[in-house]
Every structure is written in C-alpha cells, then in structure tokens.
C-alpha cells in the first residue's frame, strides 16, 4: 500500500472551513508546501487532517509576520541599514502622495506637450544646492560607481590606493565593481600609507582616471597617511586625466558639530574633483539613490551610456528626493529626520526616556550611553544618549521585544532601549506595546 494515500487531498485542505478567511493563492501555496514537507519526513502510518491544517495555519501566520512592517528603532543606530536607513518625514510623504497616487509629468513637458527629461526638476535643485555644473541620479551609489567607471574609463586603467579598496555591506567590493565595469585596476601605496608620488609613478598611457574612495565604514588610526582629493585632482589635471571621488556617505548642511571634524562636505568637495557620487539615504537623509555631481561634459557622457536606462530611478524616488532637496534649499532641516536625530541634544533625549520610564509598569533604569551614526558612516564617532535598561535575561528580552517590532540592543549584558533613535511620535505606541507584554 502506498503510504502517501493516507494524506488528505490538497483540494480538501484548501476548501476546509478553517482556512476560509485566507486568500486562495496563499492557502493553496502553503497547503502544497506543508504536504510536500511532511511527505519528505513521513515515518508514521498515517497523519491526521487536523495536524496538517494546524501546520498550514502556522505557516500562513509566519508568512504574514514576514511581511514588510514598521518597527521602532531603539537600537541607537541612526542610519540603520537593516531597518531602511533614513526615515522620510510625514510632511514630505504627504507632499509626494499626490504624485505617487496619480499620473504625473515625470517625463512629460507641460509647457510644450512633448516628452520631457525624467531628471530635469531634481537636477536643477541639485545644481542649486551643491553649486555644481551638472548632476545625475541613479538607483544607488553602487550603480553610480559602476556607471561613472564604465562611461569614462571602459577598457582603460584606474588608479586607486590600496588603503581605499573597501568592502561595504552585502560584499560590495570596490575592486570587483571596477572589474565588472570593464576597467583595469592599478593599486598603489600600502594599506596604511599612500603618497602623491605613488599615484604619479603609476600613471601610464592607458590611465584614464584617479579614484579616491571615502573610508566611510572604517577608520585607520596610528601610522597612516592618505592623499586628499584636491591634490589628486591637481595631479590628474596636470596629466590630463580625470579625478573621481566615490564619497559614499557625505553631508550637506546643518550637521552636528561633534560629527563634522575630518568629515567631507559635499559642496566643498564638488569643487575639488571632476566628478563625485554619494548615497541619497545615508547622511543626506533622503531616499535610496546614487547622486552624481560633476563637470557637464562628463555627466553628458554618463547620460549617453545605455546602462543608464537600467539604472534609472522611478517616480517614487524622484518625488521623495525632490521634496528632500526643497527642504534643504529652504533650510527646513527639521524635515530631514536623519539630521534631526543626529542633532537632538541630550536633554531632549533624556525627556523622552523619562516620559516612557514614568509610564511603564515594569522597572527600568535610566543610564547614559553612546549612539552610533550607522549606514557605513563615521565609524570612529559616537553621540551621547540616554537608555532604559530592563531587568532579566538580555537575550530573551531582546527576542521578546523584537516580536513586538521593537528593536533594542544588548549592552553590558543588559537589554536596553536607546532613545536617540526613538522618535517623539513613537513614544505612546512604545509605552502601550511594552505595557501589554507579560512576564518580562
């Protein structure tokens, strides 16, 4: 006798009354999945329909749990890559809503009734804000690096310091991107010291560009030196080459004074190289995008590359980026949430923590601590903050809070909530959620 005959038919499971409330495609998928999984591990004479249905409902609930959800970032990492990096202000979202939910003039000129430029309005604002000749936007900074190198240096050679051949999250490695772009890499210097003469001695007839990459996600300390972009640009100009700064994470305006030391400002850097690029959702505090600034003739070459079609941004990205740029131009920095969280003073953070502590039914301790910038930015810098610590097994508490979409951290064997990254409009929700939890 075929032992699998004891399994109920898939259709019988799908049509069961207990699964009636679930959409057909979802319950059909999980009915097939659970039956297949149990058949692989089938050592019993029979299996009940009730057990199958229990497993199916469990899988469906897990599926819904895995959907994209909002969380409260109590980790103390402001630009938390795994939590979506920069947060968009509600007012900026409302300003974009009409564009996103309707047809729009994303690529249509309302003046002459003809096809328009997808980037026109955003590029105009970028040129105003950064005082650059021209600009371009692609879907992230990795795409920007690839497009710049492929457009300007294909089948040529690029010089880069060994100390700047970085790897960022997701195993994105600068040398691999250079290779994928059809460009040959010439490494100069050592991991801790690179001099101007190293670049100069490496130049040959096949050299097209000198690349500088900002070490945004790690810091070199002790016996080390590097060449600034201004000097590299002068060398490139003298040798009739191009200079490119892969900035990754740069700041624009109104950043906490404790953070800006030795941290490059975009408007200054754009005057010191031929072309540069950075991420829109890091210190700039907007949406994911690769923003490229530079000489007009170079940006034109990028626009002619067929790859741009594959890397272009959609109306959602353009809408949110446009509103972020307007906020910067109007000096309305409160609407750039990343800046606000980095700039919040300690007394304001303490007030948030005290308000929550006062209303919680569980015992906590208020302590000073340190927050991080995150997002591959400023690894050697931290910001003062206040945390609430909870009594009990730290790992169990971290898991329990995570199930309620509250992401804290473990510090000194204690589970803590960091109030620099908890926004004021989340406090009441945080209080209600914690107070509804049991057996902490």
From Swiss-Prot:
GO molecular function, one term: L-seryl-tRNA(Sec) selenium transferase activity
Subcellular localization, as worded in the UniProt entry: Cytoplasm
Keywords: Cytoplasm, Protein biosynthesis, Pyridoxal phosphate, Selenium, Transferase
Catalytic reaction(s) noted: L-seryl-tRNA(Sec) + selenophosphate + H(+) = L-selenocysteinyl-tRNA(Sec) + phosphate
Transferase keyword on record: yes
Cofactor: pyridoxal 5'-phosphate
GO cellular component: a single term: cytoplasm
Domain of life: Bacteria
Name of this protein: L-seryl-tRNA(Sec) selenium transferase
Taxonomy of the source species: Bacteria, Pseudomonadati, Campylobacterota, Epsilonproteobacteria, Campylobacterales
Gene responsible for this protein: selA
